[in-house]
Amino acid sequence: MKILNISVGMMASARKNEQEQLLHAVDEAWNQGIMVVTAAGNNGPKENSVTIPGISRKVLTVGSWDDNVTETGNSGRLTKNYSGFGPTECCIVKPEVLAPGTNVKSCSKDAKGYIVKSGTSMAAPVVSGAIALAYQKYPDYTPTEMKLKLYESVYPRGEQIGRKCWGMLHVNNLVV
């Protein structure tokens, strides 16, 4: 296994031992050579709103870049601005990368086929898929090397879009 996608998170208000267990688990996976990709959480856009385990240095945290898009749902049209952002309490820029996460067709938990969902949990698998493509070209990369390759491939840069992050996922730049 090369990639672990974690599209769940816990708030800083969660029990300390549960936080530490999850952070230890993702750090250990990273140390074993597994690229850990996590969702930033939907508690933004304020600073220090990234959920655990996305605050770890040993994960790639993904936010949603299209979180201001108007969605159509059961309650009509609404606008959301939800992606968690850093910096973290340890001054780490998070999320590192942004990807599409609004109005994504996904599996229904009620076994009724598919539904449309929005959130950073929808954006993280997009990045995991792009990383899987990159591992086909760079199979010997460590998670740290892959994270650096991703950093070099984003476009536009975070400062160009007014966000504290590396920038938006650009799959073509990542795999060439």
List each model region and its residues.
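Solvent-exposed, polar/charged alpha-helical surfaces in well-ordered, non-transmembrane soluble domains
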Residues: 24-28, 60, 125-132, 144, ...
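Sec/Tat-exported extracytoplasmic proteins
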Residues: 5-8, 30-33, 40, 63-66, ...
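A short, acidic/glycine-rich surface segment
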Residues: 47-48, 81-83, 158
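C-terminal subdomain of the subtilisin-like protease fold in secreted/lumenal serine endopeptidases
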Residues: 1-5, 136-176
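Extracellular S/T/G-rich loop segment that most often corresponds to the catalytic His/Ser-adjacent loop
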Residues: 54-136, 173
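Short linear functional motifs in flexible/disordered or boundary regions
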Residues: 16, 65, 74, 109, ...
